[in-house]
Amino acid sequence: MKLRISDAPFPGAPVMVMISGLGGLGGYWLAQQNALSQAYQVVVYDQRGTGDNADTLPEGYTLTDMAQELHRALALHGVQRYAVLGHALGGLVGLELALAYPRAVSALVIINGWLSLGTWTRRCFDARERLLLDSGPAVYVAAQPLFLYPPQWAQENQPRLEAEEALQNAHFQGTENLLRRLWALKTADYRERAARVTTPVQLICARDDVLVPWTCSQALHEALPHSRLDVMTSGGHACNVTAPQRFNSLLYAGLAALTPAPHKETV
């Protein structure tokens, strides 16, 4: 698996692995990547079956598979310990990593995640799946902003949405891959395992997320033994994209509380 690893900002800098959501592309993190690279060696990547890591996913592909693939790829690059920043699906992959490799994951930040798939989010995913199967990839991609962004932000950023739509159509991961990734996402359930997570976790969510209700993060917070919950008043499902300054401020505060502050050694 191909990873994009930035130069360490100073010797011994901690590593931050950024895992995107269902779309799978590492480019999702532009608004955080540059800022975090001042204090972390940042790792971004396109998930298996997407972008630079094109592949045909097997039937029965799971989030556990996604976590194992990433952990192996990091080990091949000599990365033994790292923090994880994950959005939705990416945050759940982070939970899988924390459960399977607790000594490797120093901290975990989950954006708009959940303990188990709620009825509303399942309805949204089922509707998107029907769009994909009945109307094709172009219609699926065109509808995606309805679930990701607040209406006012979307209206004010129409040129950006058009550019994103063109890019997503050009690099569409394929119907079968997307359906298998959706299946992995919909079947993940942490109700029986969350209490075993020893990694400190920050949960960030937005009250106006129309895809994943913010109360899903609240339920996850209550189930995790070592977590903090930060609720943004607005920003939608992709709140780190639509409100990066507010999001980054919460992220930095959370990371400071979860882990020792990264710093350059002085002599």
Swiss-Prot record:
Residues 14-115 form the AB hydrolase-1 domain. Keywords: Hydrolase. It catalyses: carbamate + 2 H(+) = NH4(+) + CO2. GO terms for molecular function: hydrolase activity, acting on carbon-nitrogen (but not peptide) bonds, in linear amides. SUPFAM superfamilies: alpha/beta-Hydrolases (SSF53474). It is an enzyme of class 3 (hydrolase). Belongs to the AB hydrolase superfamily. Hydrolase RutD family. HAMAP family: RutD. This is Putative carbamate hydrolase RutD. It comes from Cronobacter turicensis (strain DSM 18703 / CCUG 55852 / LMG 23827 / z3032). The lineage of its organism: Bacteria, Pseudomonadati, Pseudomonadota, Gammaproteobacteria, Enterobacterales.
